[in-house]
C-alpha cells in the first residue's frame, strides 16, 4: 500500500486541527519531528508537539480555513486564514506518511 501523499496528509491534518484534537494531530508527526512556528522556538518530538497543540487548543478556539494546498515532492504547502482574517502559511516535509518537519509563518497580531 503506497504512503499517503503530503497534500492528503495536510488535508487530514487540517480536519484534526479544526476538531481541536491534539492526540489525533500528533499522530501525523514522526517520533523525532520538528515543528517550528517562526515566532516561537522550535518544538522537537511528537510528544512535545502534542503538548504544544493541547495547550493551544485549551487556550483559544482556532479554525484553519484552507486557501490553497500545494504539493511538491515530499513537501506540502498550506496557505490558510482564520475567521478573523489572520493569514499564514505552513510548510510540511512528509516522509513515509509522517510529518518530519513543519515551519509556519503567520501575521502576528
Q: Where do the language-model regions lie?
A:
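Conserved short-loop catalytic and cofactor-binding motifs
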Residues: 13, 37-40
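Residues that recognize and position ribonucleotide moieties
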Residues: 27, 42, 92
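Short, low-complexity N-terminal intrinsically disordered segments enriched in polar/charged residues
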Residues: 1-23, 27, 31
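Short beta-edge strand/loop motif at the mouth of beta-sheet-based domains
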Residues: 42-51
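A beta-strand edge to alpha-helix "cap/lid" segment located at domain peripheries
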Residues: 2, 36, 50-109
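Short, flexible micro-motifs
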Residues: 19, 23, 48, 100
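Charge-dense, low-complexity intrinsically disordered segments
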Residues: 4, 40-43
